[in-house]
């Protein structure tokens, strides 16, 4: 699989926002198959030390979320950002069929992907994907609504909202469902049938 859905939990909404959790799942948008999954909480202090800038409104928003969602981002097992990025890169290297062609999906590409790339830069590390392979969940949602599928209405959420891995899995599922409606897979054997 060469499609990776990422979801970040952050303490801001700008490119320099501190990341507090990274969730990722490989998936095949043509079939909906889910592949290897990745999750880590990120130590907020390490992000601030690296130069990330929190946003008060986002912090206030987090304070209003469920205790489960808050607990996931304040885990004692949270890794320093540099270790979390190394773990993500190692996960991609182990799990991706062709890392050179890895496509990274974010909700949207101007949020998760940009913030994650900025974190790699703050830590003087090379991102694990090429910038030209950023893909946008929001564009797919717009297409889905145009063909009669609204993921917020038509696909129930399974898991804890605002958990980076649960969000990534949900996004991969609805991107796949939309992809299959927009570009249906041919029926097996249809290529061999007389036209």
Each PLM stretch: what is its role?
Residues 103-110, 114-115, 149-195:
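Acidic, Mg2+-coordinating catalytic module of metal-dependent nucleases/exonucleases
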Residues 7-9, 112, 136, 167:
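Acidic active-site catalytic centers that drive phospho-/nucleotidyl reactions
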Residues 2-4, 9-106:
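Conserved non-catalytic scaffold segment of RNase H-like nuclease domains
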Residues 87-90, 94, 114, 118, ...:
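Residue-level signal for well-ordered alpha-helical scaffold segments within enzymatic catalytic domains
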Residues 92, 96, 111-132:
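Substrate-recognition/cap helix-loop segment adjacent to the acidic, metal-dependent catalytic center
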